[in-house]
Amino acid sequence: MGALDDLRVLDLTQVLAGPYCTMLLADMGADVVKVERPGGDLIRSNPPFVSDGDEEAYGGYFQSVNRGKRSLELNLGTDEDREAFLSLVERADVVVENFKAGTMEKFDCGYETLREHNPDLIYSSIRGFGDPRTGETHRQGQPSFDLIAQALGGVMEITGQSDGPPTKVGPGVGDLFTAVLNAVGILAAVHHRERTGEGQYVDTAMYDSMVSLCERTVYQYSCDGESPTRQGNSHPTLFPYDSFEAADGHVVIAAFADGHWEALCEAMERPDLAAEYPDAGSRIANRESLRAEIAEWTTAIDSETLLDLLEGRVPAAPVQNTADIFDDPHIHDREMLAEVDQPGADDQMTIAGSPIKMTETMPSPGGRAPLLDEHKTELLDEAGVDTGTNRVESDD
């Protein structure tokens, strides 16, 4: 049993932000119905694919963020499919979409129309620049992807080396962080409806989310009037808090607290540094020379020995690649690697497990991602649509 077992979600989203949002809900037990346009989600054909696949039903991108969902292919531009969709809406708790503002209205399926069919409905959108219902801006006609959101929201400006160009963060945080916030908003709206019986519109913008993610830059600029910029892997107000090269790789050390600093100096056999720079202010003021002292020590030691010296006393870790993560017992003990079937292949695919852990209703991937239109008959039957005389077909 999942915490959201009684929640029915109609998921019209595609690519990453929306599917990741609804994936979080599906992992917690929600019945997520992926309502796909003719031809399906754009990322169904994206690689990588498993090596032994006889047919490429979909790749890892689609599998990862659409696990545990059901699929129905509908063309909202046809009367039959639109009526079928409205029948689904009448039984739904939540509708989620990530189209450009105004797209659903073109099919006469906007929030106001859907509320006529289900007054308690929670309608949620993820857009690059938000929906006019929650705050109209000049950007809302513009398309957006993760890269755009990272650039506008300040993420790229503070990422990278100080003498290098603005740099995109590796994971698609413009999509993923927005997705997480949107899931929080949906669950808050569900709680509000349980107390009041009132549905509402939940709107999360990628640009807004990146500003929230970069919250430090907002108060820094407010305090000193200077725009924060790139500092590599270091921190503007904490030291040492950085990556360092070891003899066989890289490690990170976060010893900015006085006690951790003293323990680091002890491991380095440099009690003089602890005595000369006993507080955060003195360490930050002399960060370049102190960084050189630490780097001289780390480069002479292999990472395992270095981490053994610091273990339990100083926050430190190796910089791991994905193979290292797959080999880490912690990841297996926490069930952070999940095996799911891959249609058309003998081998299973490994995807990231659920990071949310609960003692009574443990979230987990609810099986593989669906084939396109795989659950059409059962979904239309549940909605009371006569699949014999009122067949709902999609026009490609």
From Swiss-Prot:
Pfam families (UniProt xref): CoA_transf_3 (PF02515)
Please give the function described in this protein's UniProt entry.
Answer: Involved in the methylaspartate cycle. Catalyzes the transfer of the CoA moiety from succinyl-CoA to mesaconate to generate mesaconyl-CoA (2-methylfumaryl-CoA) and succinate.
Write down the superkingdom of origin: Archaea
Enzyme Commission numbers on file: 2.8.3.26
> Which PANTHER family does the record associate with it?
SUCCINATE--HYDROXYMETHYLGLUTARATE COA-TRANSFERASE (PTHR48207:SF3)
Keywords from UniProt, A to Z, are: Transferase
Recorded catalytic activity of this chain's protein:
mesaconate + succinyl-CoA = 2-methylfumaryl-CoA + succinate
The Gene Ontology terms for molecular function here are: CoA-transferase activity
- Chain's gene name: mct
**Under which name does UniProt file this protein?**
Succinyl-CoA:mesaconate CoA-transferase
Signal peptide start and end residues:
none
Keyword flag Transferase: yes
Q: Which family does it belong to?
A: Belongs to the CoA-transferase III family.
